[in-house]
From Swiss-Prot:
Biased composition (Polar residues): 408-431
Subunit-level organization: Homomultimer; forms the nucleocapsid. Binds to viral genomic RNA. N0 interacts (via Ncore) with the phosphoprotein (via N-terminus); this interaction allows P to chaperon N0 to avoid N polymerization before encapsidation. Interacts as N-RNA template with the phosphoprotein (via C-terminus); this interaction positions the polymerase on the template. Interacts with the phosphoprotein; this interaction leads to the formation of membraneless organelles that function as viral replication factories.
Name of the protein: Nucleoprotein
Ncore: region residues: 1-403
Molecular functions (GO terms): RNA binding; structural molecule activity
Pfam families: Paramyxo_ncap
Bias-annotated ranges (Basic and acidic residues): 433-464
Region (Ntail): 404-525
Biological classification of the source: Viruses, Riboviria, Orthornavirae, Negarnaviricota, Haploviricotina
Record region (RNA packaging and organization of the helical nucleocapsid): 1-375
Disordered: region residues: 403-472
Family to which the UniProt record says this protein belongs: Belongs to the paramyxoviruses nucleocapsid family.
Protein's UniProt keywords contain Electron transport: no
């Protein structure tokens, strides 16, 4: 049996192992297309700022071609380094494109103010065709995207500090787009705006230079559809991370934005480890989880073997990303999601509408959190040197804070997964219907007694009795159907108040000549 388990472990490890780079053939190369990337030909800040101005206007042209747009974005992304050409040549290794670097210098003879550097050959016409676009023949003004503040005419500047701030503002908006461009481009605007506000408050960017929505949409769509552009951006991030010592301010900002980019598309895998395994609840000992725990273990080993590219496998469209999908461990993932929605309010907005989602194991995770609230892990307590008396004190404090948290906030998590509680809801509805049948004769009896005692007030007497009785029944049914322990205390207090009120109103209709005065003290007593 031991040999079988050992063979099983080796089999799972070999199954999830990526293929090794071996064989007699060379690297497979695709049909390449040429990408022209303009780079500054001198160290002048005027040249760089003028090139940045022309490139931003080019990107805002709705009719720009895809390869030209990619080249312009690569040029903008590399403008913050001292030698953009060396950077691009060092980090670019793409089988789909061939990058052609073109040096740009200032010129007074061209319409754009820039020309391509060459030896003895005039490239003014080629530079104008590249940096400018023709107006339509019908005389209408051509639409182009620019900054939201239309008062900004150009961004040419001669001050190095000011140029770095403007460049950082533009680069921040481009890098923020990468976080959601592949996984959720349609719902990315809200999160992108939050990050923009963050960097504005930190004075890393200039708020007045917020780019137009159309400009950002154009870049987001290009990032989503162009794998070569994403490869360059990931390679640039990794190159910045490998740089020793202090980094330029723009480089540090890119690393900060990388925290939102890294592990994009791997939420199922990361959250399963975080909530399903790291919480170490005893439910992990179930036989149903044995196979999936082995799968998670092999995937974690595979993740480590992939090295520094592992967090970007979805952005880079690596085919191995399918192995990390939640469909490979559906029971453990459903269990982890149940734990997550109980521990973190931010998990309540997740979409659980997957075909492999299992509601039973989702509720298992919820119940593990609820019933384990305030308990101390014996293994962890022994490692930390916590005594039994200290563990008991921690349990009491944790139970108190848990009750206080439940009373203060019900949270969005139960509202998001209410459809999963079909069993509890049906049982509560069944018990409520039985109580309705038992109370119905009593309600009818009270109504007949009221009508006999005072016939000339038949309408006025019947109305409060039936209203109070039906109100009591409806409230009982509703509160019994709601078995959420997060609101049990409030529900009990509300039920006592409503029962006392209904009793007062019912007693006033049982033939007494003088109506009983309503007083809050009766409810409190």
């Amino acid at each position: 049996m031991a040999s079988l388990l050992k063979s099983l472990a080796l089999f799972k490890r070999a199954k999830d192992k990526p293929p090794l780079a071996a064989g007699s053939g060379g690297a497979i190369r695709g049909i390449k297309h040429v990408i022209v990337v303009p780079i500054p030909g001198d160290s002048s800040i005027t040249t760089r700022s003028r090139l940045l101005d022309r490139l931003v206007k080019m990107v805002g042209d709705p009719d720009i071609s895809g390869p030209k747009l990619t080249g312009a974005l690569i040029s903008i992304l590399s403008l913050f380094v001292e030698s953009p050409g060396q950077l691009i040549q060092r980090i670019t290794d793409d089988p789909d494109i061939s990058i052609k670097l073109v040096e740009v210098v200032q010129s007074d003879k061209t319409q754009s103010g820039l020309t391509f550097a060459s030896r003895g050959t005039s490239m003014d016409d080629e530079a104008d065709r590249y940096f400018t676009y023709e107006e339509p023949n019908d005389g209408e003004e051509r639409q182009s995207y620019w900054f939201e503040n239309r008062d900004i005419q150009d961004i040419e500047i001669q001050d190095p500090e000011g140029f770095n701030m403007i460049l950082a503002t533009i680069l921040a908006q481009i890098w923020i787009l990468l976080a959601k461009a592949v996984t959720a481009p349609d719902t990315a605007a809200e999160s992108e705006l939050r990050r923009w506000v963050k960097y504005t408050q930190q004075r890393r960017v200039i708020g007045e230079f917020r780019l137009d929505k159309g400009w950002l949409d154009t870049v987001r769509n290009r990032v989503a559809e162009d794998l070569s552009l994403r490869r360059f951006m990931v390679a640039l991030i990794l190159d910045i991370k490998r740089t020793p010592g202090n980094k330029p301010r723009i480089a540090e900002m890119i690393c900060d934005i990388d925290t939102y980019i890294v592990e994009a598309g791997l939420a199922s895998f990361i959250l399963t480890i975080k909530f399903g395994i790291e919480t170490m609840y005893p439910a992990l000992g179930l036989h149903e989880f044995a196979g999936e725990l082995s799968t998670i273990e092999s995937l974690m080993n595979l993740y480590q073997q992939m090295g520094e590219l592992a967090p970007y496998m979805v952005i880079l469209e690596n085919s191995i990303q399918n192995k990390f999908s939640a469909g490979a461990y559906p029971l453990l993932w459903s269990y982890a999601m149940g734990i997550g929605v109980e521990l973190e309010n931010s998990m309540g907005g997740l979409n659980f509408g997957r075909s492999y989602f299992d509601p039973a194991y989702f509720r298992l995770g919820q119940e593990m959190v609820r019933r384990s609230a305030g308990k101390v892990s014996s293994n962890l307590a022994s490692e930390l040197g916590i005594t039994e008396e200290e563990a008991r004190l921690v349990s009491e404090i944790a139970a108190y804070t848990s009750d206080d948290r439940n009373n203060r906030t019900s949270g969005p998590k139960q509202a998001q997964v209410s459809f999963l509680r079909t069993d509890q809801g049906s049982e509560a509805q069944h018990s409520a219907s039985k109580k309705d049948e038992a109370r119905a004769p009593q309600v009818k009896k009270e109504t007949r007694t009221s009508s006999k005692s005072d016939k000339h007030k038949e309408g006025t007497d019947k109305e409060p009795v039936s209203s109070s009785a039906m109100t009591l029944i409806d409230v009982d049914t509703t509160l019994e159907a709601d078995t959420d322990p997060l609101e049990s205390k409030k529900s009990a207090e509300a039920l006592l108040r409503l029962q006392a009120m209904a009793g007062i109103l019912g007693d006033s209709t049982l033939g007494n000549d003088s109506l009983r005065a309503y007083n809050d003290k009766d409810i409190l007593n």
